[in-house]
Design a protein with these regions (language model features):
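Receiver (REC) domain active-site loop signature in two-component systems and cognate sites
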Residues: 58
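Short acidic/histidine-rich motifs immediately flanking catalytic phosphotransfer sites
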Residues: 47-51
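Conserved sequence signature across two-component system core domains
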Residues: 8-9, 34, 52
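Non-catalytic signal-transmission and effector/linker regions of two-component phosphorelay proteins
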Residues: 1-4
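Active-site residues of response regulator receiver
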Residues: 55
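Two-component/phosphorelay signaling modules centered on CheY-like receiver
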Residues: 12-32
Length: 68
């Protein structure tokens, strides 16, 4: 069973690039995407992921704030 990954980045282009890279490996599956820390926080509170790929500089809630 592939590991479920949450991809978080405010840039739509970077989200797409990261997802494309992750999807090339059958051991991983992009389960969800978020455009900022608040959206990611909501997803994390409702779902379980094996890993999170996280941008640091984002509006509303940045990556470091999300980690806290």
């Amino acid at each position: 069973m592939p590991k479920k990954i949450l991809v978080v980045d405010d840039s739509a282009l970077m989200r797409r690039v990261l997802c494309d890279i992750i999807d090339t490996d059958i051991r991983f599956q992009v389960a969800d995407r978020a455009k900022d820390g608040l959206e990611a926080f909501d997803l994390l509170s409702r779902n379980s992921y094996d890993a999170v790929v996280l941008d640091v500089n984002m509006p509303r809630m940045n990556g470091l704030q999300l980690l806290q």
